[in-house]
Swiss-Prot record:
Belongs to the GatB/GatE family. GatB subfamily. Its EC number is 6.3.5.-. Coiled coil: none annotated. It catalyses: L-glutamyl-tRNA(Gln) + L-glutamine + ATP + H2O = L-glutaminyl-tRNA(Gln) + L-glutamate + ADP + phosphate + H(+); L-aspartyl-tRNA(Asn) + L-glutamine + ATP + H2O = L-asparaginyl-tRNA(Asn) + L-glutamate + ADP + phosphate + 2 H(+). Heterotrimer of A, B and C subunits. The lineage of its organism: Bacteria, Pseudomonadati, Campylobacterota, Epsilonproteobacteria, Campylobacterales. Allows the formation of correctly charged Asn-tRNA(Asn) or Gln-tRNA(Gln) through the transamidation of misacylated Asp-tRNA(Asn) or Glu-tRNA(Gln) in organisms which lack either or both of asparaginyl-tRNA or glutaminyl-tRNA synthetases. The reaction takes place in the presence of glutamine and ATP through an activated phospho-Asp-tRNA(Asn) or phospho-Glu-tRNA(Gln). PANTHER family: GLUTAMYL-TRNA GLN AMIDOTRANSFERASE SUBUNIT B MITOCHONDRIAL AND PROKARYOTIC PET112-RELATED, GLUTAMYL-TRNA(GLN) AMIDOTRANSFERASE SUBUNIT B, MITOCHONDRIAL. It comes from Campylobacter jejuni (strain RM1221). This is Aspartyl/glutamyl-tRNA(Asn/Gln) amidotransferase subunit B. GO terms for molecular function: asparaginyl-tRNA synthase (glutamine-hydrolyzing) activity; ATP binding; glutaminyl-tRNA synthase (glutamine-hydrolyzing) activity. Keywords: ATP-binding, Ligase, Nucleotide-binding, Protein biosynthesis.
Length: 472
């Protein structure tokens, strides 16, 4: 039996307005090679100037994971040649990163586990190679975009743990609002270092790096395939030939990893301090940066202060947008548990395909009005589902307008309900007698008959109240 050893390197693009060493915009989707200048094109004489906001965002992350923030950190040149790297070196951090020795906690199958974070350092992103037919093109818009590279300790022992770690990290980054962490656009990318060893062995064997994984599903599949490949090679006696230190890519069509190139050692990058950038010396006020409420803290508050079930609280903190939507709901002085039900179950049940809570046709204000109409007895909970479905499809229609159009306004007028109840009790005198002689289950019969006569428009609470009075 083998033990799996996984360490993850996550590159997240920081959401600064400009690049890390120049004033070019970082906006995504612009025409190729338009967000560039002499600095990010590496023209002679152009010098880098560090973006202060990128430093602040790195510090915020460090505080969120209980890390050490180094008051002095150094930028280095990482030397390698690739078409999308104009300078033929990347400005990164090596021996003195801005953040080190952090931690986060994951829960897998009901068990909590601490995962160490070795370091988080600032660096610049490369450009992008685009391969079309017989040509390769280079777009340098992305070159110089600020990255925070977050390196975990090799303490993850399964693909499930790796995905749990990444989801937790992704959530923290989003709640800090230091990156949009959009995996499809490449602003949250993961490299996985995977190796195996016999159970009980403490030696670290040959690790394989799987590059640029950009979905949780593919990360899980890539790790599972690589573990299977290495395990089979060990059992077949071909481990030393088949498993070499290399970089592999994940084939998302066939769900296999394929060799890309040999993996370089740090010495091959010839790191040395960048002579164009002074060491970063942090003043004390930089270390006092306030960070927002994090997912675990928010979850605890929802449970302790609002009385929400843990499983519901997990859904509410599953994304920054979800928690913001919920907090916008309860800010309207609504019952928190009612809000949870209508958000987690009813609205989320309608969001399919490209629709998410972020672009939901029904916003928090509109859903809040619907919940208010349930609370004040204007409509029943059952009718409210029809109203929600209607405004979901007809986005220009307001809640009160939809209630009128659908004819779902609840009747709470005592005299109208009383008249129908009198009629039902008179028509069922024998059942009234049975009820009064102890057959209390008949109460439901009277309620059902009343609601039927009222075509579902009667306020159920009022019906119950009046029936109890009439039946004694």
């Amino acid at each position: 039996m083998f033990e799996v050893v996984i360490g993850l390197e996550v590159h997240t693009q920081l959401n600064t307005k400009t690049k890390i060493f120049c004033s070019c915009a970082t906006s995504f989707g612009e025409a190729p090679n338009t967000n560039v200048c002499p600095t990010c094109l590496a023209l002679p004489g152009a010098l880098p100037v560090l973006n202060e906001e990128a430093v602040k965002k790195a510090i915020a992350f460090g505080k969120a994971v209980n890390a050490t923030i180094n008051k002095k950190s150094v930028f280095n040149r990482k030397n390698y040649f690739y078409p999308d790297l104009p300078k033929a070196y990347q400005i990164s951090q090596f021996d003195i990163p801005i953040v080190e020795k952090g931690e986060l906690f994951i829960n897998v199958k009901g068990e909590n586990k601490r995962i160490g974070i070795t370091r988080a350092h600032l660096e610049e992103d490369a450009g992008k190679n685009i391969h079309e037919n017989n040509f390769s093109k280079v777009d340098l818009n992305r070159a110089g975009t600020p990255l925070l590279e977050i390196v975990s300790e090799p303490e993850l022992r399964s693909s499930d743990e790796a995905v749990a770690y990444l989801k937790k990290l992704h959530s923290i980054i989003r709640f800090l609002d230091i990156s949009d962490a959009n995996m499809q656009e490449g602003s949250f990318r993961c490299d996985a270092n995977v190796s195996i060893r016999p159970k009980g062995d403490t030696k670290l064997y040959t690790r394989v790096e799987i590059k640029n994984l950009n979905s949780f599903r593919f990360i899980q599949k890539a790790i599972e395939y690589e573990v299977k490949r290495q395990s089979e090679a060990w059992e077949d006696g071909t481990y030393e030939q088949e498993v070499v230190q290399e970089t592999r890519l994940f084939d998302t069509t066939n769900l296999v990893t394929r060799s890309m190139r040999g993996k370089e050692e740090a010495a091959e990058y010839r790191y040395f301090p960048d002579p164009d950038l002074l060491p970063v010396l942090l003043k004390d006020e930089f270390l006092d940066i306030k960070i927002p409420e994090l997912p675990d803290e928010k979850k605890a508050r929802f449970i302790d202060e609002l009385g929400i079930k843990e499983s519901d609280a997990e859904v509410l903190i599953s994304s920054l947008e979800m928690s913001r939507f919920f907090e916008s709901l309860i800010s309207q002085n609504l019952n928190p548990k009612l809000c949870v039900n209508w958000l987690n179950t009813e609205l989320m049940g309608l969001l399919k395909g490209e629709l998410t809570i972020e672009n939901s046709p029904v916003d928090a204000q509109k859903l809040g009005i619907l919940i208010k109409r349930i609370e004040d007895g204007t409509i029943s909970a059952k009718a409210a589902k029809d109203v929600l479905a209607f405004v979901f499809e007809n986005t220009s229609v307001e809640i009160d307008e939809a209630i009128e159009k659908l004819g779902l306004k609840q009747v709470s007028d005592d005299s109208a309900i009383e008249a129908v109840i009198e009629q039902i009790l008179n028509a069922n005198a024998d059942k009234v007698a049975e009820y009064k002689s102890g057959k209390e289950k008949l109460f439901g019969f009277f309620v059902g008959q009343t609601m039927k006569e009222g075509k579902g428009a009667f306020n159920p609470a009022k019906v119950n109240e009046i029936l109890k009075t009439k039946l004694g």
